[in-house]
UniProtKB/Swiss-Prot annotation:
Glycosylation: residue positions: 29, 68
Transmembrane segments: 74-94
Similarity section: Belongs to the asfivirus B117L family.
Name this polypeptide is given: Uncharacterized protein B117L
Membrane topology per record: Single-pass membrane protein
Biological source species: African swine fever virus (isolate Tick/Malawi/Lil 20-1/1983) (ASFV)
Compartments, record wording: Host membrane; Virion
Keyword entries, A-Z: Glycoprotein, Host membrane, Membrane, Transmembrane, Transmembrane helix, Virion
One of the record's GO cellular component terms: host cell membrane
Amino acid sequence: MGYTIQLDKDGDYYWDEDPTHHDPYMRANATSHAAASHAAASHAAASHAAAPHTAVHHAFHEPFIKLNLTDKNIFNGLGFILIVIFIYLLIITLQQMLTRHIYNTVQQCVKTHLDSKNLQ
């Protein structure tokens, strides 16, 4: 499922999580058109005329920032497997380095200890 966030120059944003609609701006325009025509056709439109007008005004702004957030990220499919293998190899390498360091340190300590015993 894809998400689309659109931000216009006034800072108003539109959120769409319907995967069948490609562009939520088209849907926002259609919705506000329907609201405006319905309000104009209604006899009691005088009290409600302000709200559809602002909706039309805001819906027709060009998108200033268009951000598409889809579920295709690095944790999908092959990318996830490659990341897991890379982390696994990194952990093995670090573990071998640490083991070698500990072994060398212990060996040096034992050698120093034996040398000090031989000197006595």
